Amino acid sequence: LPAIAEEPPQRVRAWLVVPGEAELRDQAVLKLPKGYRFLGGQETQRLLKQMGNFPSGAELGLITATAENEQWFMVVRYIDAGYVKDDEAANWDADALMTSIKEGTDEDNKTRQAQGFPPLVIRGWEEKPHYDKAASKVVWAISAQERETVGVNYNTLALGRQGYLSMNMVGSLEQLPVLKPHVGLLLSNVEFIEGKRYTDFDSTTDKVAAVGLSALIAGAAIKSGLLAKLWAFIIPLVIAGKKLLMLLVIALGGLAAKYFNKKPKPEQAGGGGGLSS
């Protein structure tokens, strides 16, 4: 990753590790508990791009744990798709969804191979999709294999009045028992603000999304850059016992170790994600 390592450190901001609230555009707030780091949107987009991914511009930040033995990360995005109807959630067919995901991945593999990436083989559900209607939130997990590497993509959606938040976590399959509590905590700590909540929807004025929850689940699995591209860089290092956080330090332009060993002052993060204590 020479291009990443050569990135000037003065262009990079430190991780925000102070417990507080990360503002997710003008839509929602993420309460960041002790033990987590948050990287702003602009830095996250640059990091993803430098690691071979193609950011959509919807990235608001990246979350990881402060503990060095916690080798995972989560990317937070907001998609201004409109109000996503949840009426089909009660009749989900998980097997049919998985078939759709595998078919879409087979097609996407043609593009991956043309770009020099090995094909991705979807193994199946590690956690079938389930919808919390009261909270308007969805959780599911899929495992996939790339060469000898098996990874897990843990996906969550939080539905709002004008769109939805996607919180996408990547880790190795053996980490699954460790990932699940983080997913639950972080998802429960994100809430849309008043006027932007799912229950604030006004059918007379608000835009309705062109797709439903099933399409979002299938599309997120097939088209997620994290599932399809970042594993080629990150998960092999995790499997080899190397530290994900050290890779991120290099990727962010050689950030000094002091950023990980002392408590920085709160500051605004770029790209729509800010942290306040």
Question: What is the predicted role of each segment?
Answer:
Residues 6-28, 42-152, 207, 212-218, ...:
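Conserved polar/disulfide-associated segments of primarily extracytoplasmic proteins
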Residues 209-274:
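C-terminal single-pass membrane-anchor helix
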Residues 155, 186, 269-277:
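N-terminal leader-region detector that preferentially activates on the first domain or presequence
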Residues 30, 34, 95, 99, ...:
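Solvent-exposed, polar/charged alpha-helical surfaces in well-ordered, non-transmembrane soluble domains
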Residues 25-28, 32-42, 187, 193:
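Proline-anchored loop/turn motifs at beta-strand termini and strand-loop-strand connectors
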Residues 6, 116-200, 204:
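Short, well-structured beta-strand
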Residues 18-31, 174-185:
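Short aromatic-glycine motifs in intrinsically disordered, low-complexity regions
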